């Protein structure tokens, strides 16, 4: 029997659609599914919605009601403590505003039949509502069906929504009720460490709602000061401690998972928020605690994280307590950025952008304005951008630029030499940009002038958080 656990708090606008996606499962709701619905002290009509389904399906619906809000962890623990007593129970966690594809549970049943030794398995996640598309970790589902965390240490699992647990994993799962974010990642990864593996249900889909008002727990968590204080101990370091108890060390899977998630703190959008939330002293303490978290994570693991060069440099700088920069290797016509033997980026793949004509800057009126402000590179005063068209080279004028890049309040890039202005020759409807640096010329992207605007070609910034 599949038990679908849905904690709900003030989600009357979504909960019916969520429950209906379970009732409509092709495997057969009344024959194979039990709904465990928890109203966590809602102040809207959520509890009344749950009672409607209990009245309609009395043999397939269990409801619990808390007078006061206890938090999602307490709600899940309440359900688990009862369900784990049931024979042959398999639990699926579903958030009260998310949905299941109609064959999701059937796909899970097929998976467990083929993989009888696996006790944890996850559905693929697709976003819907305010944002559509695939979760950035969905690539895992195309690579393998069962993740052995010793071999596939770079296959992290963070979310609990869409995850099935049974047998020993169901007995082991427990959520830290002191936490109101990342409690799911901590709980599921303790189980994964215990099992040593987890499954990927390639054709099963979990629809994750991104609300237009960003009111979900995940969205709100970044504005909670606790995320930058106690969370580092209760989340990251707690998982590391569990790894030490289980394996006598922080295994590569945990190292990669923590470093992969920690990089989010260093993204531009998060950095600006952190700077507003934390005082100067709190920021210093936060960085000090980040260093403690990073201590057991090997540089090789960090170098494998899919992130931008400045984020990786900042992670290593915090870890080592000194400024660390990616290695630059110059060839005849390129510059390769790498760290610990892992190639991160190539200069030739970066883009120069043209933003339009200038109207207010004296001496530059009517000229086109461009900038080469890639996160991987900061131009020096001796560097310059050039343009080439059918063997003719033109060097544009340098234009004042105040753009800078900050991470956790620290300036990591200064683009004062990155901007330029130029007049477009009448017969230059297309040309290629290049940069002269370190005594060599590196060709960059090709641009085309069409219908009064510029279109540029070239690779998008990989893992660009800026």
Give residue spans per PLM region.
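Conserved donor NDP-sugar-binding/catalytic core segment of glycosyltransferases
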Residues: 99, 103-137
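Conserved nucleotide-sugar donor-binding catalytic segment
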Residues: 147-237, 241-252, 258-261, 265-266
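Cell-envelope/extracellular polymer assembly enzymes that use nucleotide-activated donors
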Residues: 1-3, 34, 186
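Short, well-formed alpha-helical segments that are part of the catalytic scaffolds
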Residues: 11-25
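A conserved acidic beta->alpha catalytic loop
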Residues: 39-48, 68
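Glycine-rich, basic loop-to-helix element that forms the pyrophosphate-binding segment
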Residues: 66-86
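Short beta-strand-to-loop acidic/aromatic patch adjacent to the donor-nucleotide binding site
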Residues: 87-99
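Non-catalytic N-terminal targeting/anchoring module and adjacent flexible stem/linker
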Residues: 1, 52, 248-249, 253-466
């Amino acid at each position: 029997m599949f038990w679908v656990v849905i904690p709900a708090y003030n989600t009357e606008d979504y909960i019916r659609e969520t429950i209906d996606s379970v009732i409509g499962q092709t495997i057969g709701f009344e024959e194979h599914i039990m709904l465990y619905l928890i109203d966590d002290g809602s102040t809207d009509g959520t509890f009344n919605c749950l009672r409607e389904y209990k009245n309609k399906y009395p043999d397939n619906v269990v409801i619990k009601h808390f007078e006061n809000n206890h938090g999602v962890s307490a709600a899940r623990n309440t359900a688990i403590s009862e369900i784990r007593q049931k024979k042959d129970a398999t639990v699926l966690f579903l958030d009260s505003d998310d949905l299941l594809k109609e064959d999701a549970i059937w796909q899970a049943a097929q998976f467990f039949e083929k993989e009888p030794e696996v006790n944890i398995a996850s559905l693929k996640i697709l976003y819907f509502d305010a944002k559509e598309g695939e979760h950035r970790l969905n690539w895992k589902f195309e690579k393998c069906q069962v993740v052995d965390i010793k071999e596939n240490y770079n296959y992290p699992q963070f979310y609990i929504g869409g995850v099935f647990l049974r047998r020993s994993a169901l007995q082991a799962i427990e959520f830290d009720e002191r936490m109101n974010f990342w409690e799911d990642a901590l709980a599921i990864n303790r189980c994964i460490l215990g099992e040593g593996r987890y499954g990927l249900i390639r054709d099963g889909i979990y629809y994750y709602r991104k609300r237009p008002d960003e009111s979900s727990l995940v969205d709100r968590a970044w504005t909670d000061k606790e995320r930058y204080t106690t969370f580092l101990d209760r989340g990251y370091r707690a998982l590391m401690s569990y790894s030490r108890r289980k394996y006598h060390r922080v295994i590569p899977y945990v190292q990669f998972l923590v470093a992969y998630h920690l990089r989010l703190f260093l993204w531009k959008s998060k950095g600006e928020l952190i700077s507003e939330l934390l005082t100067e002293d709190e920021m210093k303490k936060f960085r000090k605690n980040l260093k403690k978290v990073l201590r057991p994570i090997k540089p090789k693991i960090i170098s494998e994280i899919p992130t931008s060069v400045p984020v990786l440099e900042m992670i290593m700088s915090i870890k080592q307590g000194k400024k660390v920069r990616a290695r630059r290797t110059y060839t005849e016509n390129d510059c390769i950025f790498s760290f610990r033997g892992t190639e991160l980026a190539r200069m030739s793949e970066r883009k120069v952008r043209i933003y339009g004509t200038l109207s207010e800057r004296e001496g530059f009126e009517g000229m086109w304005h461009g900038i080469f402000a890639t996160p991987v590179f900061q131009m020096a005063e001796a560097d310059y951008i050039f343009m080439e068209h059918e063997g003719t080279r033109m060097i544009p004028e340098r234009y004042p630029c105040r753009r800078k890049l900050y991470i956790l309040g620290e300036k990591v890039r200064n683009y004062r030499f990155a901007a330029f202005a130029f007049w477009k020759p009448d017969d230059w409807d297309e040309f290629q940009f290049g940069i002269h640096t370190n005594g060599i010329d590196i060709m960059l992207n090709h641009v085309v002038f069409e219908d009064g605007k510029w279109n540029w070609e070239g690779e998008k910034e990989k893992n660009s958080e800026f």
